């Protein structure tokens, strides 16, 4: 097992990466890495909120303002030099700051934290 620490001592290399909007990814996996980094590299980055910045007030419905396929944007991915499938990667978050003065969370039929699954039943209309 290989344990890589991305946020290590202060004398480690630092990657500052602020992605352009068109560099955000909307799926997990399959995208080429934005950077190759060495174990111990500290990453200073930014990402968009779960609705791609489209919801800007409490009276906006996410289903009405987000373009299809533009929810949950991702920053990266980063390729860790020397990491192999099966390795354990340790990531230490040193600091987390909100990008805006507001936050958002929501759920709607078939999506969100309060929906039933094949393992968790809820009382509600069938989809």
Predicted regions and their residues:
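Bacterial Sec-dependent signal peptides at the C-terminal "C-region" and cleavage site
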Residues: 2-12
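N-terminal, charged/glycine-rich beta-strand/loop interface patches
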Residues: 12-127
